[in-house]
Amino acid sequence: MNGAESLVATLLKGDVNVCFTNPGTSEMHFVAALDQYEKMRSILCLFEGCATGAADGYFRMQRTPASTLLHLGPGLANGLANLHNAKKASSGIVNIVGEHALDHIKLNAPLTSDIEGIARPVSHWVKTSKSSKDIAIDGAEAIQKARVTPGQIATLILPGDTAWNEGNKPENIEFKNSSNKVSADIIQEGIEALKAAKNPLILVGGAALEEKNLIKIAKIADKMNCQ
């Protein structure tokens, strides 16, 4: 099992089973790994902005993260606009970006760039995985970050040698519950504020706009005579 296969296995273990891709040569080992796992659905997109926009839309509909695969810094740059939108919408995405092999970066090839610097403004979490032995752990951390409520952009940078060198099976990796529960005290504060208001108004956003939650909010609004 190479590093790329280790990462795909980790994604599946973390219930990330869709990858919207626009790869290049640096990502071929990961592309091959995607094809080896039947449970992983790999969707080729003809433009990076399509891949990142599709991942955003997937989260908004399914409320669970998908992954993306982009080619180096320029490929990431082409997908920035929809990563920006996804971050503003609190969509969870595991954003995988290929990188040159670590010992090749110093040669400053035409597509060499500061991928971490490009990714940081549109990501909640950014990490370059520098060893094929660590990619499963780094991938699990990316999934964990993407699942933090209500959703986050986790950018994992995958150098070529991290992908092709021998990796580890993600057997011992565990995923913790990353949901943020609202305390009873905050709920009570909200109730008291609604009771005290002369013309109460409830403003909602994010996951509160899902149908099941809007039904609950409508009942609260009716009970409290809210707008």
Task: Tell me what each language-model feature is.
Residues 1-227:
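N-terminal alpha/beta PP-like core and its mobile active-site loop of ThDP/TPP-dependent enzymes
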